[in-house]
A protein has these predicted regions:
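Alpha-helix N-cap recognition
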Residues: 7-8, 27-31, 206, 243
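Conserved anion/nucleotide-ligand pocket segment
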Residues: 11-26
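Single conserved hydrophobic/aromatic residue that forms the stacking wall/gate
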Residues: 1-10
Length: 260
């Protein structure tokens, strides 16, 4: 039953009808599970209970042709749990990777065929396991998570464009009009990352100093509306880099908090 299962492994639940990590909960023990049922009452029937998977999210994003084959594909990585980001326990941070691993590409292309993703944007999500999980796989294995027949949300398409020096919307328009890309695909392969700050928190490097230090790398620094700010941050920074070390240095500067 649910209670005996919760003693053996961490659980999480998500709304049967919802968007992203909104309305998700994680349970580490029977007490937390009981509290959830008491709070939700009959509404608990509107949730799906699942085993919690410790993994980073890797995606397969792009535009498919009439044969469900990618005209262009790229991948972005979210190292921390989206649920923990949404609940304010982790800062918003994710990045477009310059390359797609052969395993991820194989699984992504197979999913496009299986779901008949013809002549459309696609946004496929996978877990890359951080630790071995009985019955699921070993650390580093990739597992299917979610299929979306639409572009990735937020500023992700812009980030894909910055990372590759292309226009994914133009590629989509070419697909609609001609069935193939008539404009350049990726001109280069860079990292493009997104970091989010909350106004109520203090950070080691002030906003203006961060903008000045990374002015040659920043693509955009948008403010988010209140409806999105709780999960993603009030202030976003989107920047591109040639190598991972430079990107990680930016992450530290953008998200480091004052030492206690």
């Amino acid at each position: 039953d649910l209670h005996s299962t919760s003693r053996r492994q961490r659980q999480m639940c998500i709304r049967d009808s919802g968007v992203g990590a909104n309305g998700t909960h994680k349970f580490k023990n029977k007490t937390e599970l009981n509290k959830f049922f008491q709070q939700e009452g009959p509404n608990a029937a509107n949730y799906i209970l699942e085993e919690f998977v410790d993994g980073e999210i890797v995606t397969f994003d792009g535009v498919a042709d009439a044969n469900a084959e990618p005209i262009y594909a790229a991948s972005h990585v979210t190292p921390d749990s989206i649920m923990e980001i949404a609940h304010g326990k982790k800062p918003m941070w994710y990045y477009v990777a310059p390359e797609i691993s052969p395993e991820l590409r194989k699984m992504g292309e197979a999913a496009l065929k299986a779901f008949g993703a013809k002549s459309r944007f696609f946004h496929l999500e996978f877990f890359r396991l951080k630790t071995a999980k009985p019955s699921l796989g070993n650390a580093g294995d990739i597992l299917g998570l979610e299929v979306n027949m639409r572009p990735a949300g937020g500023y992700t398409v812009d980030m894909l464009n910055y990372a590759g020096g292309l226009d994914l919307y133009q590629i989509w328009a070419d697909m609609v009009a001609f069935g193939a890309a008539h404009h350049p695909l990726a001109r280069y392969h860079r990292y493009c990352c997104c970091a989010g700050r909350h106004d109520e928190l203090r950070y080691r490097m002030p906003h203006e100093e961060l903008l000045k230090k990374y002015r040659s790398c920043l693509n955009a620094a948008p403010r988010l509306p209140e409806v999105l700010a709780r999960e993603m941050g009030d202030q976003l920074y989107i920047a591109s880099f040639e190598d991972e070390a430079a990107m990680q240095a930016f992450r530290r500067d953008a998200l480091a908090r004052p030492r206690e």
